[in-house]
Design a protein with these regions (language model features):
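Serine-hydrolase catalytic core
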Residues: 271-327, 362, 368-377
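Short beta-strand element of the alpha/beta-hydrolase
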Residues: 79-81, 90-100
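N-terminal cap/lid segment of alpha/beta-hydrolase-fold proteins
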Residues: 33-88, 115, 128, 168-175
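Gly/Ser-rich "nucleophile elbow"/oxyanion-hole loop immediately N-terminal to the catalytic nucleophile
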Residues: 163-208, 224
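Surface beta-strand/loop "capping" patches
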Residues: 342-381, 397-416
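Hydrolase active-site cap/lid region
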Residues: 216-265, 322-325, 331-338
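Cap/lid segment of the alpha/beta-hydrolase catalytic domain
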Residues: 101-102, 123-182, 234-250, 254
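Short amphipathic alpha-helix adjacent to the substrate-entry channel of hydrolases
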Residues: 107-127
Length: 469
C-alpha cells in the first residue's frame, strides 16, 4: 500500500524542546547495541531432527545490564530456537521476539506456528526468549521480581529522576532488549554458516514490548528488511497518550506499572521528552523505509483504537495495517496469523502485494483497490452507547461485520454515522488472495464518530521535571 493521504485534522502535541544542559544525541541506542560486551557467548544445547526439518536450541548470553550494585542479575541470557527446513530455499529468516522468564531453565521448544511458517515458506524461522530478561530485583527497591512493564517503568523512573542525563541512559531497558535481538541475529547467521546456509536478511516480528523492540531493532540494524510490530499502537507517544486520557478520563489499568512509578507525572517535561528521543520509534521513523505490517486489536486495553492517526501518515515506504476486530492486547481468540505468514512470504519472495489506498474524510472511510486484485471487502462496526471507549473489557466482543458487494470501479466507502447516544467505531477490512495458502488480511484505520472528546486534556496533579512551556 502506497503513501496515504488523510484529510481529517490530526492532534499535534509533539514536544520538540530538549534540556538546555545536554545536547541531543539520537545515537545512544545504536552506540549501546554495538559496544562490544565480553559477556556475549552462546552454545548449541540440543539439536532435534524431524522428518522435514531440524530444530536447534541455543542458549545465548547477549551481554550485561547495569552493575551488581544496581541489580541482582546483570547477565542477560536467552533461549533461541531455530527451525531449519530440509528444503531451505531462502536467504532471509523470520525472527520472532518473545518474552518469558529466566525461571524457565529448559530450552525453548519450537511452537507449531514456528514450524508451520518455516515449512510453508521454505525459510529459517527462529524465536528468541527473555526479552526483557526477567524477573529482576533492583537494589534499594522495595519490590521483588519485576517483570515486563514493571521492570521497564522502574528504569524509566531512575533515568528521569537522575535528570535524563547521558550517564544514566543505560537504565532504559529498551537498550539491552534491542541488543539481545541484534545478537540473536548474529547467532542465527553463525548457525546458518555452520550448516552451509547463508542468511543475509531478517524480518522481525514481536508483540507489545517486543513490538516496540521490533521497531528499535530495525532502527539499528540494516539486516532487517521488514518488520511486523504487533499490539504496540503508540507511536508518537505524547499525543497518543493525551488522546488516551481524553477518551477515558483516566489511565487504563493496563498501564498501572507506569502510573505507579510516577511516569505520567513527568509528561510535559524536558526529561520525559529526552527519554522518548532516545527510545521511541517515532523519533526514527524517517530512517525506516522498509515494509511494515502493523497488527493491532480494536479492543486493546493499552491503546485507543484510533491511535493510528498520530503516526500513520508519517510512515515512509510500503506500510500495511490490520486492526483485528474484537482483539484485546493479547489478540486472544480473535487473531489468525495467516496474514503475517502471507506478508512474510511476499517479502522474502519479492512478490508484489496488490495495491490499495484508503483515507478518512469527515465521518467516512474511503478505499480504492487495484482492479487486478482478487479480493473481498467487509465493514466492521461497534457502538458504545455511553462513552468513547471500545476496549474489549468494556464493550465485550461487540464488533459486527457486514459483507460488502464488489463494485464495478473497485471503490468503497463506509459512513460511520453518529449514534443516537455515545460513540460508534468502524473500519473496512480487505482480504486479498496472496497466491499461497494464506490470504492477506488488511484493514483501514478505525474511525470514531462523533469526532469529540468526553474529557479534558491530562494535567499532572504533581508535575515533575523541568516543565515545557
Amino acid at each position: 500500500m502506497k503513501k496515504l493521504i488523510f484529510s481529517t485534522p490530526l492532534i499535534l502535541l509533539i514536544i520538540l524542546t530538549i534540556s538546555n544542559c545536554e545536547k541531543s544525541n539520537n545515537n545512544h541506542l545504536k552506540d549501546y547495541v554495538y559496544t562490544k560486551d565480553p559477556a556475549f557467548r552462546y552454545e548449541i544445547v540440543q539439536i532435534d531432527t524431524a522428518k522435514s526439518w531440524k530444530e536447534y536450541r541455543i542458549k545465548m548470553i547477549s551481554g550485561t545490564w547495569l552493575t551488581k550494585n544496581e541489580v541482582n542479575n546483570t547477565e542477560w541470557w536467552h533461549w533461541i530456537t531455530i527451525v531449519v527446513p530440509n528444503k531451505t530455499l531462502e536467504t532471509e529468516a523470520l525472527l520472532i521476539v518473545g518474552g518469558g522468564s529466566s525461571k524457565k531453565k529448559e530450552p525453548l521448544n519450537a511452537s507449531e506456528l514456528l514450524i508451520n511458517i518455516a515449512l510453508e515458506t521454505n525459510s529459517i524461522v527462529a524465536e528468541i526468549s527473555n526479552i526483557p530478561f526477567q524477573p529482576l530485583n533492583f537494589s534499594n527497591d522495595s519490590k521483588d521480581d519485576r517483570y515486563e512493564d514493571d521492570l521497564i517503568a522502574y528504569g524509566w523512573k531512575k533515568f528521569l529522576e537522575g535528570g535524563a542525563k547521558d550517564k544514566d541512559v543505560e537504565w532504559l531497558a529498551r537498550l539491552p532488549m534491542t541488543r539481545a535481538v541484534v545478537r540473536g541475529m548474529d547467532v542465527i547467521q553463525k548457525v546458518g554458516d555452520n550448516i552451509n546456509i547463508k542468511i543475509n536478511e531478517f524480518v522481525i516480528a514481536g508483540a507489545s514490548k517486543r513490538g516496540w523492540t521490533t521497531w528499535t531493532t530495525a532502527v539499528v540494524d540494516d539486516r532487517v528488511i521488514a518488520i511486523v510490530p504487533i499490539v504496540i499502537d503508540l507511536l508518537n507517544v505524547v499525543p497518543s497518550f493525551d488522546h488516551h486520557w481524553r477518551c477515558y478520563g483516566e489511565w487504563s489499568p493496563a498501564i498501572d506499572d507506569y502510573v505507579n512509578e510516577g511516569i505520567t507525572d513527568w509528561m510535559g517535561s524536558k526529561e520525559y521528552n529526552r527519554l522518548l528521543q532516545i527510545v521511541e520509534p517515532y523519533s526514527f521513523i524517517d530512517q525506516l523505509s522498509i515494509p511494515k505490517f502493523l497488527i493491532n486489536g480494536t479492543g486493546d486495553e493499552f491503546f485507543v483504537t484510533d491511535s493510528w492517526q498520530f503516526y500513520w501518515n508519517k510512515l515512509i515506504g510500503e506500510n500495511f495495517l490490520q486492526y483485528v476486530p474484537n482483539g484485546n492486547h493479547g489478540l486472544t481468540g480473535s487473531y489468525n496469523p495467516g496474514s503475517l505468514i502471507a506478508f512474510y512470504n511476499a517479502i522474502i519472495t519479492n512478490r508484489n502485494i496488490p495495491e490499495f489506498n484508503w483515507y478518512v474524510s469527515n465521518d467516512s472511510i474511503y478505499l480504492d483497490v487495484d482492479s487486478n486484485a482478487d479480493y473481498t471487502i467487509k465493514s466492521w462496526q461497534a457502538i458504545n452507547e455511553n462513552t468513547r471507549d471500545f476496549r474489549v473489557d468494556v464493550i465485550g466482543k461487540s464488533w459486527k461485520s457486514d459483507e460488502i458487494y464488489k463494485t464495478v470501479n473497485d471503490k468503497y466507502y463506509l459512513h460511520v454515522s453518529k449514534p443516537t447516544s455515545g460513540y460508534k467505531a468502524g473500519l473496512l477490512e480487505i482480504t486479498i488472495d496472496s497466491g499461497t495458502n494464506y490470504p492477506f488480511v488488511f484493514t483501514t484505520g478505525t474511525l470514531i464518530s462523533p469526532n469529540s472528546y468526553p474529557f479534558m486534556p491530562f494535567e499532572p496533579l504533581t508535575p515533575k521535571g523541568k516543565r515545557i512551556k
